[in-house]
């Protein structure tokens, strides 16, 4: 049996299994209807250990969970732990927004996915996982990129939103739309060994994201998981805490009387710590939830709120075409026996990236260190004794972004004239030239 037929048969078996579970559920409901139980007998067994916890409110609390609709924006490092716990707890409808696909580099932290699903849409992979976990729930997927045009249509009808995204732009959009629709948001982020979590727009009286952050961080201060890395269990713990906070919201643990805005900070290394800080409430001058707000549904949908312009973006395209070379051109000069005699080969990735995998001929000077030299040639010569103003310098980084910035530094600050960066960087070289080099 070939792979195609095997995959087809597996899908058919999965569909039959789900259909069987749904039929059993319908039968159980009919059998229980005469007794007027709010849950099926199987649901009593499934959620029993949860219902006997006094704080959940017993059967009434479980019915609340069953009647609640939660939207999870992002099925990555935060969404992956949050989704199965929400499904396992019995949240009746779960929506998943994500247009990304599963990649091998995701799997160390996004443990809801697995190796067999590489290339599959994350929202579909998540749907398959949580419907296997709990066939009593309804799961809706949105394989689209969230934007000003579709956010209102996607959000409406949901009681709570989990913001599991990794960019300030999307966080502002999620918060703005939620405020306009009167939806409470559980928002979190994580990077490296740390994470943070908060609740926004609680019952339309709590602060929104703009109350906390009226202006976004500068683009060069924002680091993604791809750039900064992340420890799986650390972000997983934050995602699990998001599920806890969502259950507390649904079960009425938080009330208008006892809720106080907070920011929870988690750090996994060197010793684990969890701190909670009291945050300020709604701000009267907030453009989204304040008295004279201008960020309305109409303004967002018409595109009058330019999130890209507001949050900014790092401009990496700072080199002229003749200051860049392709990986093919680099390969030709790299294979020249006199390469090192004619060129200085500089790798500007962070040192711990360089240690994972590098060209043996490359000298590692992270771009941060180059910046700190502030154009001082003597400081550069301490690292590169052979470098002179007329040296031919070839610069490499991970993706071909920092190498452009380094090219500008060496030309504009240090006064070098013969500097070129490798377009696409180290990873482009691996993809196009030599797949035997480790790619991380």
Curated annotation (Swiss-Prot):
Q: What does the record give as the active site?
A: 225, 397
**Pfam families linked to this entry:** Rhodanese, ThiF
Coiled-coil regions listed: none
The places in or outside the cell where this protein is found are: Cytoplasm, Cytosol
Q: Which residues carry this modification: N-acetylmethionine?
A: 1
EC number of the protein: 2.7.7.-, 2.8.1.-
List, in alphabetical order, the GO biological process terms annotated in this UniProt record. Answer: protein urmylation; tRNA wobble position uridine thiolation
As cofactor, the record names: Zn(2+)
Q: Phosphoprotein as a keyword? A: yes
Where does this chain mainly localize? cytoplasm
Q: Which residues are recorded as binding Zn(2+)? A: 208, 211, 286, 289
Q: List residues binding ATP.
A: 77, 98, 105-109, 122, 166-167
Pathway-wise, it operates in: tRNA modification; 5-methoxycarbonylmethyl-2-thiouridine-tRNA biosynthesis
Q: Keywords of this protein's UniProt record, alphabetized?
A: Acetylation, ATP-binding, Cytoplasm, Metal-binding, Multifunctional enzyme, Nucleotide-binding, Nucleotidyltransferase, Phosphoprotein, Transferase, tRNA processing, Ubl conjugation pathway, Zinc
Query: What detail does the entry give on cofactor binding?
Result: Binds 1 zinc ion per subunit.
Provide the GO MF annotations for this entry: adenylyltransferase activity; ATP binding; metal ion binding; thiosulfate-cyanide sulfurtransferase activity; URM1 activating enzyme activity
Q: Which residues are annotated as modified residue Phosphoserine in the UniProt record?
A: 326
What Gene Ontology cellular-component terms does the record carry?
cytosol
Q: Where is the Rhodanese domain?
A: 339-438
Q: Which SUPFAM superfamilies match?
A: Activating enzymes of the ubiquitin-like proteins
Q: Which family does it belong to?
A: In the N-terminal section; belongs to the HesA/MoeB/ThiF family. UBA4 subfamily.
Q: What does the protein in this record do?
A: Plays a central role in 2-thiolation of mcm(5)S(2)U at tRNA wobble positions of cytosolic tRNA(Lys), tRNA(Glu) and tRNA(Gln). Acts by mediating the C-terminal thiocarboxylation of sulfur carrier URM1. Its N-terminus first activates URM1 as acyl-adenylate (-COAMP), then the persulfide sulfur on the catalytic cysteine is transferred to URM1 to form thiocarboxylation (-COSH) of its C-terminus. The reaction probably involves hydrogen sulfide that is generated from the persulfide intermediate and that acts as a nucleophile towards URM1. Subsequently, a transient disulfide bond is formed.
Its name, as the record gives it, is: Adenylyltransferase and sulfurtransferase UBA4
Q: Which organism is it from?
A: Saccharomyces cerevisiae (strain YJM789) (Baker's yeast)
State the organism's lineage. Answer: Eukaryota, Fungi, Dikarya, Ascomycota, Saccharomycotina
